[in-house]
């Protein structure tokens, strides 16, 4: 029995040299799974440094966390910044919660240039409460997450809209306290409000005051100013931003027409035709036909295509440019040399002169030889 050919690049996972797989982008839902594992690894004596490290691992520096729900007195919406997110998660456990994790079902992912959006309409936040009695609370709602599209894949925006919640009590507890009406009454009361403890709700209400004061506290810590001076400085800067004139909208640069330069051949032909005539006839023809000064040059622009502006029947735009380097008397001294050129024979077409009544600009610029 012949054995399979040995692959020199194959490395057994059980051998001493195990080859790792090629790294790939982590799925957004897996980041939530990693966050659940990190929350389960929390100890009872976790300090603020642990919560700051937790927020740094899973949240961007400019991340925001928003909670929307409806209480007895109306709908509520709380949004906190990155500096207050660690404290929010710590208040959940300080309110009597022993375990916290999130379950995402049928989530939809959409990829953008610099972010990944996860929209889960069936998200459940599960919390285990040990006080005053063992209770499992399932808070259902819609969770919308925005991750940064990079290697860290941290959360940029967190928006959890709570629809309903359920508090589950073990059935085995009821027979144990069937004869105690006070315990049964206590079991019938809810220990949370829309799945959130009173400790967390009080912190969210406090964040409404703390969030605008972040600038004051940061300025006080940086410049060591008194609270009154910090407030004056912040109000003055806010007033400056309000009275500052609005920025002018950027104007789009106007597209310039491309000018067609005079070719060398046309320049040589025109100079040869002009030198064939005498000095007096050249001045008269220039004055009669063009009537331009010696320093003006007529330039014909190309018609603009591909969505540009068109003139009447696509006429070319003629622009007058001033040529300071042009000298009308230049080349007059070479007239004698040109007339004595051997190219001007008796039957040469260059030696024949056009009729006097023929204009310089004609539809057929090539002169016919006189018979």
Curated annotation (Swiss-Prot):
Any single Pfam family the record assigns to this protein: LID
| Record's function text | Binds to the LIM domain of a wide variety of LIM domain-containing transcription factors.
List the GO biological process terms: negative regulation of transcription by RNA polymerase II; nervous system development; positive regulation of transcription by RNA polymerase II
> What does the record say about tissue specificity?
First expressed at stages 15-16 in presumptive limb mesoderm. As limb outgrowth proceeds, expressed in the entire limb bud, concentrating in the distal mesoderm throughout limb development. Both hindlimbs and forelimbs exhibit similar expression patterns.
Where are the residues of the annotated region Disordered? 244-289, 325-371
Where does this protein reside within or beyond the cell?
A: Nucleus
> Which superkingdom, per the lineage?
Eukaryota
This one is known as: LIM domain-binding protein 2
Please give the organism.
Gallus gallus (Chicken)
Q: Which InterPro entries match?
A: LID (IPR041363), LIM-bd/SEUSS (IPR029005)
Q: LIM interaction domain (LID) domain: from which residue to which, for each copy?
A: 296-335
Q: Which UniProt keywords apply?
A: Nucleus
């Amino acid at each position: 029995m012949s054995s399979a050919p040995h692959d020199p690049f194959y490395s057994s996972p059980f051998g001493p040299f195990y080859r790792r797989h090629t790294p790939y982008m982590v799925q957004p839902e897996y980041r939530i799974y990693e966050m659940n594992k990190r929350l389960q690894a929390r100890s009872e004596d976790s300090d603020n440094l642990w919560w700051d490290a937790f927020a740094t691992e899973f949240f961007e520096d400019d991340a925001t966390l928003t909670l929307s729900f409806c209480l007895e007195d109306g709908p509520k919406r709380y949004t906190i910044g990155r500096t207050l997110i660690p404290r929010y998660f710590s208040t959940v456990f300080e309110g009597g919660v022993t375990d916290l994790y999130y379950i995402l079902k049928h989530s939809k992912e959409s990829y953008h240039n610099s972010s990944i959006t996860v929209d889960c309409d069936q998200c459940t936040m599960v919390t285990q409460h040990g006080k005053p009695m063992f209770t499992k609370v399932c808070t259902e709602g819609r969770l919308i997450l925005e991750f940064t599209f990079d290697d860290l894949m941290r959360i940029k925006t967190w928006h959890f809209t709570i629809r309903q919640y359920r508090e589950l009590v073990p059935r085995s507890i009821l027979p144990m306290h069937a004869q105690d009406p006070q315990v049964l009454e206590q079991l019938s009361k809810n220990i949370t409000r829309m799945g959130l403890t009173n400790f967390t709700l009080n912190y969210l209400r406090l964040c409404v005051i703390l969030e605008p004061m972040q600038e004051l506290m940061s300025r006080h810590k940086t410049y060591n100013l008194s609270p009154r001076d910090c407030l004056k400085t912040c109000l003055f800067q806010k007033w400056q931003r309000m009275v500052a004139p609005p920025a002018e909208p950027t104007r789009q640069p106007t597209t310039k027409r491309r000018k067609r330069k005079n070719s060398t051949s046309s320049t040589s032909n025109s100079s040869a035709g002009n030198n064939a005539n005498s000095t007096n006839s050249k001045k008269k023809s220039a004055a009669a036909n063009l009537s331009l000064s010696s320093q003006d040059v007529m330039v014909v622009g190309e018609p603009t295509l591909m969505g540009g502006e068109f003139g009447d029947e696509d006429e070319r735009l003629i622009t007058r440019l001033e040529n300071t380097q042009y000298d009308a008397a230049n080349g007059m001294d070479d007239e004698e040399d040109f007339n004595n050129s051997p190219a001007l024979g008796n039957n040469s077409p260059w030696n024949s002169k056009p009729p006097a009544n023929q204009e310089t600009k004609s539809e057929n610029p090539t002169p016919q030889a006189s018979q």
